[in-house]
């Protein structure tokens, strides 16, 4: 677990727990928003629900993902209180309307050097079928941190980053896959008519 102040950028927190060798190879936070590089962990807890990593680790409010939140209450004589267990839900996803989050404790897992992968499909339906089966397989035969179906109309927005790896005539599934499970991932991709572009 890691205890941190609410104002730390999620990207900085992730870098710190990966660098800390309390666990050989470092650790990683369980989930983060797509705005990881500019978002604070306190903002994510106050307004977030899920994100990259949720397909593997659940959502923020699931028991044990956040184990402590320290809050300054919004009352005439503010108090500093620490919430644990089910009491965390009193301020999680409340957008700061009932207290100011100043610190929190998050559960961690051993870090994995996730493989960023793009699978291309002839139809969005094929991409969704693949994504659904891959999601169901998590925990039994596949380990993935992210599985996101992306419709072809979005492809032009990725040209600068991905070039021809996401062409406008294909639908895609963006994913982060455990390298130890990549061969099984590729078998499942082929089963659904997908091709690997990254």
Predicted regions and their residues:
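Noncatalytic alpha-helical scaffold of FAD-dependent oxidoreductases
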Residues: 1-198
């Amino acid at each position: 677990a890691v205890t941190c102040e609410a104002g730390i950028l999620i990207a900085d927190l992730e870098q710190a727990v990966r660098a800390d060798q309390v666990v050989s190879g470092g650790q990683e936070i369980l989930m983060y928003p797509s705005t990881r590089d500019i978002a604070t962990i306190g903002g994510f807890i106050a307004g977030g629900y899920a994100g990259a990593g949720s397909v593997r680790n659940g959502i923020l409010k699931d028991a044990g993902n956040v184990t402590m939140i320290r809050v300054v209450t919004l009352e005439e004589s503010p108090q500093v209180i620490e919430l644990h267990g089910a009491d965390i839900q009193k301020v999680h996803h409340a957008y700061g309307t009932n207290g100011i989050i100043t610190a929190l404790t998050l559960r961690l897992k051993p870090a994995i050097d996730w493989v960023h992968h793009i699978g291309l499909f002839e139809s969005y339906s094929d991409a969704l079928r693949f994504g659904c089966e891959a999601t169901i397989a998590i925990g039994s035969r596949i380990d993935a941190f992210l599985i996101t179906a992306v419709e072809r109309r979005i492809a032009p927005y990725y040209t600068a980053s991905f070039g021809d790896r996401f062409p406008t005539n294909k639908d895609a599934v963006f994913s982060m896959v455990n390298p130890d499970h990549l061969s099984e991932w590729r078998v499942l991709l082929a089963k659904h008519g997908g091709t690997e572009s990254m």
